[in-house]
Amino acid sequence: MLRLFRFTLFMIILLMIMLPQTGFARGGSGYAVLDGETGRILIGSNSDARLPIASLTKIWTALVAIENSDLQDEVVISSKAAMSEGSSIYLQAGETVTVETLLYGLMLRSGNDAATALAEHVGGSVEGFVKLMNERAVIAGLTNTVFMNPSGLHHEEHLSSARDTAEMLRIALQNKTFEKIASTVLYRADTVNGMLWENKHRLLREGSGMAADIDDETEQPVSSLKSATGTAFAGKTGFTKVAGRTLA
């Protein structure tokens, strides 16, 4: 019974949506729901349209990093990583952080600095890592996907589709390390600032009962590390002005 319930959840979270402000799956938007075991598309609209996916990119960034590094590898944060544009986990140039911590910062807080640091460590450079991402996408059969960076910041050629993005998550969740990280709601970082990170994915927080556990003064989560157990157990959110809001 538990296995059936988990499989049902698996299918639900394999929904990827790009919603404009005024409608559902119109114009530059699309969605897809896949069978969690076979990858067969169950329902969708504009599911093969090539669109910007924002930080859903980080699903693939995380998987490629996990497959090509050790979680306990130590990464010295470069100035380039620390100064990355967009969302951040506030890494400081020169500090040393494990790959594992960077992965949690990537998936829970969508840190672009974490994405850059992982890319430099695993690929030797951001460009080298992006090459690995695209090679892995070809192996996975993601025919509508091209990556230009590891964070999902807007680039005209950085595109995927709802079907491909759902497939990214389906494939990534077959990796136990990824599943553990992507389903974590709270994580205490071993960075210089030592913050307690809460997953930005609202469905995960609400499912675990953690949505309201925030200190009003510090705006920081007050509970210990916890994994999602509700209607969604893993996923990723994203946003750019061009892509709009994205969800997996």
What are these regions (language model features)?
Residues 1-9:
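Bacterial N-terminal signal peptides that target proteins for export
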Residues 3, 21-22:
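Protein maturation boundaries and topogenic segments
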Residues 5, 47-49, 76-78, 218-223, ...:
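N-terminal start-of-chain detector that recognizes signal peptides
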Residues 8-19:
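Bacterial N-terminal signal peptides
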Residues 9-11, 94, 225:
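Extended hydrophobic/Leu-rich segments
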Residues 23-163, 167-176:
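Active-site-adjacent loops and short helices of periplasmic peptidoglycan-processing enzymes
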Residues 26-30, 125-248:
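Penicillin-recognizing serine hydrolase domain
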